[in-house]
From Swiss-Prot:
<keyword id="KW-0805">Transcription regulation</keyword>
<feature type="modified residue" description="Phosphoserine">
    <location>
        <position position="298"/>
    </location>
</feature>
<dbReference type="GO" id="GO:1904871">
    <property type="term" value="P:positive regulation of protein localization to Cajal body"/>
</dbReference>
<keyword id="KW-0539">Nucleus</keyword>
<feature type="domain" description="xRRM">
    <location>
        <begin position="449"/>
        <end position="562"/>
    </location>
</feature>
<keyword id="KW-0597">Phosphoprotein</keyword>
<dbReference type="InterPro" id="IPR002344">
    <property type="entry name" value="Lupus_La"/>
</dbReference>
<dbReference type="InterPro" id="IPR036388">
    <property type="entry name" value="WH-like_DNA-bd_sf"/>
</dbReference>
<comment type="similarity">
    <text>Belongs to the LARP7 family.</text>
</comment>
<feature type="modified residue" description="Phosphoserine">
    <location>
        <position position="261"/>
    </location>
</feature>
<dbReference type="Pfam" id="PF00076">
    <property type="entry name" value="RRM_1"/>
</dbReference>
<feature type="region of interest" description="Disordered">
    <location>
        <begin position="188"/>
        <end position="368"/>
    </location>
</feature>
<dbReference type="GO" id="GO:1905382">
    <property type="term" value="P:positive regulation of snRNA transcription by RNA polymerase II"/>
</dbReference>
<keyword id="KW-0508">mRNA splicing</keyword>
<comment type="function">
    <text>RNA-binding protein that specifically binds distinct small nuclear RNA (snRNAs) and regulates their processing and function. Specifically binds the 7SK snRNA (7SK RNA) and acts as a core component of the 7SK ribonucleoprotein (RNP) complex, thereby acting as a negative regulator of transcription elongation by RNA polymerase II. The 7SK RNP complex sequesters the positive transcription elongation factor b (P-TEFb) in a large inactive 7SK RNP complex preventing RNA polymerase II phosphorylation and subsequent transcriptional elongation.</text>
</comment>
<dbReference type="GO" id="GO:0048024">
    <property type="term" value="P:regulation of mRNA splicing, via spliceosome"/>
</dbReference>
<protein>
    <recommendedName>
        <fullName>La-related protein 7</fullName>
    </recommendedName>
</protein>
């Protein structure tokens, strides 16, 4: 009994130790991969290829006397945040680094070797890639181009506003030979791609034009549909050919049987109905079971079709007796062959499954050279620079022509305004314009002039609707110059042209109160003066706001857009003829 209890205790202890080990295994975090990723990222940041392009990090190194950079700076980078935010873990990962070294405290790092001059063959080692997928990233490009050599630097331009990639990238290799290899192996543009390389995306205010994307997608869909239709047509033709072949063979087989049936149909009608029924039953039972007997029957019928009718009947009965035995033999042979095929097929399937399992254990995204053909266009950077020069020259020429057309449109519009009016009326208009212009300029310079009894205060128990809705409800009664309202406010002010207009709105309070629960009152006294001061202060603040200076191409494009909008507005206007015209 004691031995049994001792054995049970040992078993229990072993189980508890196993459970503890399992718990420890679960608790253990996978740090090796994280350490390797941290070391790789920091080595890249402090490498020659990156520091020659990364101005911020280079300046941080130059600022410090010893060339040390604090690890806390690296933790602030987004890519490092994804890996870790622990400075000690970063220091641990960089102990065995070949590029950087730690200080004695383990809180700062620096390059082991000083940064040299920028290499001159950088452009020759760099490759330009276009027709990239929409959600492309550095790891994808490194995986694809890493087959051709050691990728040192990858640059993927993005739109500033949206953050989407522009569809092209630059890949820098360690040697010129590797870059040439990438151009040779990975330059496989699809048939749909434009003949001339070089993507210079069309943008409006540094944003991709969505309409162009939609058009491109529609074109791609149409092409796909066309291909599918062609494939369907080819398949349909093949099927038709197969059906015609089968029908021809059937026709060949059915000719003798039809002749036999003709002979049978020519029999006199003196035969009794009982014999006919028996014959029909026998034929119906024999036909579905066996198809192979048709040839023998047809051949016998062909041979003896000219003989007497009684002989034909005897031959048919003999064939019917022979057919089942032949069919049973054939069925046995077929069953044996199918069993053999099944055995061989099972063996093949099992071997294939084993090989698939082995492949799945490895990384799924590994690709060997030549296995997949990625539709990319790859050029040397020097070729791309030549294309860029051509593009800039074309842009310059187009902008010059646009400038000329804008100046011509302006001169034509001035000629129309001056030449279209008679001289006498023109003189009067000049005087009136000269009188009106200074007054308008004064109003614009000083802002709205103080007029008492023009401002109406609107108070609501609930947040007021949008400015447009308030304006529309008031404009139905009288002309509104301005509505001072912020979203979610329960109070607002409306400025009218004359005190009579404001009074008309107050008089129509009953009509407004039916639709909206508003309280209306005209401002007067100190409240009115304070509000007018507020108007002037707000106006001055608006004028003092910094404006974006548009120069060069942007300035020209904005001018052209304004002219286009003005023309469209003129075209959309209704031409109204008077009764006497």
């Amino acid at each position: 009994m004691e031995t049994e209890s001792g054995n049970q205790k040992n078993v229990m202890e072993e189980e508890s130790t196993e459970k503890k080990k399992e718990v420890e295994k679960k608790k253990r975090s996978r740090v090796k991969q994280v350490l390797a990723d941290i070391a790789k990222q920091v080595d890249f940041w402090f490498g020659d290829a990156n520091l020659h392009k990364d101005r911020f990090l280079r300046e941080q190194i130059e600022k410090s006397r010893d060339g040390y950079v604090d690890i806390s700076l690296l933790v602030s980078f987004n890519k490092m945040k994804k890996l870790t935010t622990d400075g000690k873990l970063i220091a641990r990962a960089l102990r065995s680094s070949a590029v950087v070294e730690l200080d004695l405290e383990g809180t700062r790092i620096r390059r082991k070797k000083p940064l040299g001059e920028r290499p001159k063959d950088e452009d020759e080692r760099t490759v330009y890639v276009e027709l990239l997928p929409k959600n492309v990233n550095h790891s994808w490009i490194e995986r694809v181009f890493g087959k051709c050599g050691n990728v040192v630097y990858i640059s993927i331009p993005h739109y500033k506003s949206t953050g989407d990639p522009k569809g092209f990238a630059f890949v820098e290799f360690e040697t010129k030979e590797q870059a040439a290899k990438a151009i040779e192996f990975l330059n496989n543009p699809p048939e749909e791609a434009p003949r001339k390389p070089g993507i210079f995306p069309k943008t409006v205010k540094n944003k991709p034009i969505p309409a162009l994307r939609v058009v491109e997608e529609k074109k791609k869909k149409k092409k796909k549909k066309g291909r599918m239709k062609k494939e369907d047509n080819v398949q349909a033709k093949e099927e038709n050919m197969d059906t015609t072949n089968t029908s021809i063979s059937k026709m060949k087989r059915s000719r003798p049987t039809s002749e036999g049936s003709d002979i049978e149909s020519t029999e006199p009608q003196k035969q009794s109905s009982k014999k006919k029924k028996k014959r029909d039953r026998v034929e119906a039972s024999s036909l579905p079971e066996v198809r192979t007997g048709k040839r023998k029957r047809s051949s016998s019928e062909d041979a003896e079709s000219l003989g007497p009718r009684s002989k034909v009947k005897k031959i048919i009965q003999k064939d019917i007796i022979k057919e089942p035995s032949e069919a049973s033999k054939e069925n046995r042979d077929i069953e044996i062959s199918t069993e053999e095929e099944k055995d061989t097929g099972d063996l093949k399937d099992s071997s294939l499954l084993k090989t698939k399992r082995k492949h799945k254990k490895k990384h799924k995204e590994r690709h060997k050279m030549g296995e997949e053909v990625i539709p990319l266009r790859v050029l040397s950077k020097s070729e791309w620079m030549d294309l860029k020069k051509e593009y800039l020259a074309l842009q310059k020429a187009s902008m010059a022509s646009l400038k000329k057309t804008i100046s011509q449109i302006k001169s034509e519009s001035e000629m129309e305004t001056d030449g279209g009016v008679p001289q006498k009326t023109g003189m009067k208009n000049e005087k009136t314009n000269s009188e009106e212009c200074p007054t308008q300029e004064k109003v614009n310079a000083t802002g709205p002039q103080f007029v008492s009894g023009v401002i109406v205060k609107i108070i609501s128990t609930e947040p007021l609707p949008g400015r447009k809705q308030v304006r529309d409800t008031l404009a139905a009664i009288s002309e509104v110059l301005y509505v001072d309202l912020l979203e979610g406010d329960t109070e607002c002010h409306a400025r009218f042209k004359t005190p009579e207009d404001a009074q008309a709105v107050i008089n129509a309070y009953t009509e407004i109160s039916k639709k909206h629960c508003w309280k209306l009152e005209i401002l007067s006294g100190d409240h009115e003066q304070r509000y007018w001061q507020k108007i002037l202060v707000d106006r001055q603040a608006k004028l003092n706001q910094p404006r974006e200076k548009k120069r060069g191409t942007e300035k020209l494009i904005t001018k052209a857009e304004k002219i286009r909008l003005a023309k469209t507005q003129q075209a959309s206007k209704h031409i109204r003829f008077s009764e006497y015209d």
